[in-house]
Regions:
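Ribonuclease/tRNase effector modules and their secretory precursors
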Residues: 1-77
Length: 77
């Protein structure tokens, strides 16, 4: 995961201001979603994930947000 550890990526789900949206471009075989929010270390992180069962999530990838993604996130909140 590009500069973001698995443990750090999983903390984004605790961000009450995080934004979740569908990832239609990568959802051919499974319903992938993307969350953008702050990790507990304060980084703005983008995580691609799939909900497997209730309360079970599989992380696919995670990375720090680009400057454009950061601006988009700030305007969506």
């Amino acid at each position: 995961m590009d500069g973001v550890t698995f443990d750090e990526a999983s903390t984004v789900f605790k961000d009450l201001l995080a934004v979740i949206f569908g990832d239609e471009d990568h959802s051919e075989r499974e319903n992938r979603e993307i969350i953008i929010g702050h990790s507990l270390t304060g980084k703005l992180v983008i995580v691609s994930f799939v909900e497997r069962q209730q309360d079970r999530i599989r992380l696919i990838s995670a990375r720090e947000a680009t400057s454009k993604e950061r601006k988009d996130y700030e305007t969506q909140r």
